[in-house]
C-alpha cells in the first residue's frame, strides 16, 4: 500500500481512543493506527547525541538486548509520531494484528516534519522506529531495513493499535 493511500485511509479512520486498566492497575489509552501499517524501521542509539536530553539519559540506562534492540526494564526502546505520545520515558505497548503485545518505551520522538499530516506515520510509511545498536542488529533486519524480519517473527505483520500508559520508566 502506498504512503498516499495510507494517508487517505488515515483521514477516513476515526481514531478510537479508549481508557482501560491493565492487570496491574495502570491505566492506558488505546490509540488506533492507520489500516495496514506494518513497517517498523530502526535507528542507531548513537544518533541521540544531545547529552542534556532525557533521550540521551535514557540510553545511558538502556542495554542492548535480543536482535540488537535497546531495552529499558524489559521494554524495547522506540520512537513514534507525536499523535501517539510525546513524553519521553512513557510506557507503550505495540499490539500486533496477530495478537502479540510488544512492550516498549518511548525513548525518542519522531519530529512532526518527518511524519504524515496526522503525525502517525513516518514519511516512509513507518509506524514504529526501534532504537538499536547497529553492531548487534539482526542481520536480516539490517538487510531489509525493517524490524519485521527479526528471527522470532514476533514483529511480523501489521500493527493493530498502540497502548499509551499513564506511567513512565
Identify the role of each PLM range.
Residues 24-169:
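Solvent-exposed, well-ordered loop and adjacent helix/strand elements within mature globular domains
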Amino acid at each position: 500500500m502506498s504512503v498516499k493511500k495510507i494517508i487517505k485511509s488515515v483521514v477516513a479512520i476515526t481514531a478510537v481512543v479508549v481508557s482501560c486498566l491493565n492487570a496491574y492497575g495502570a491505566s492506558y489509552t488505546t490509540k488506533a493506527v492507520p489500516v495496514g501499517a506494518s513497517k517498523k524501521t530502526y535507528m542507531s542509539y548513537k544518533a541521540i547525541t544531545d547529552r542534556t536530553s532525557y533521550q540521551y539519559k535514557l540510553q545511558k540506562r538502556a542495554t542492548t538486548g535480543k536482535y540488537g534492540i535497546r531495552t529499558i526494564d524489559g521494554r524495547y526502546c522506540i520512537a513514534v509520531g507525536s499523535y501517539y505520545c510525546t513524553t519521553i520515558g512513557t510506557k507503550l505497548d505495540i499490539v500486533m494484528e496477530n495478537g502479540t503485545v510488544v512492550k516498549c518505551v518511548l525513548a525518542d520522538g519522531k519530529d512532526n516534519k518527518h511524519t504524515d499530516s496526522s503525525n502517525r506515520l513516518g514519511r516512509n510509511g513507518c509506524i514504529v522506529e526501534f532504537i538499536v545498536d547497529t553492531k548487534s542488529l539482526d542481520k536480516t533486519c539490517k538487510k531489509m531495513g525493517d524490524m519485521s524480519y527479526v528471527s522470532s517473527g514476533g514483529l511480523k505483520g501489521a500493527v493493530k493499535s498502540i497502548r499509551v500508559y499513564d506511567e513512565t520508566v
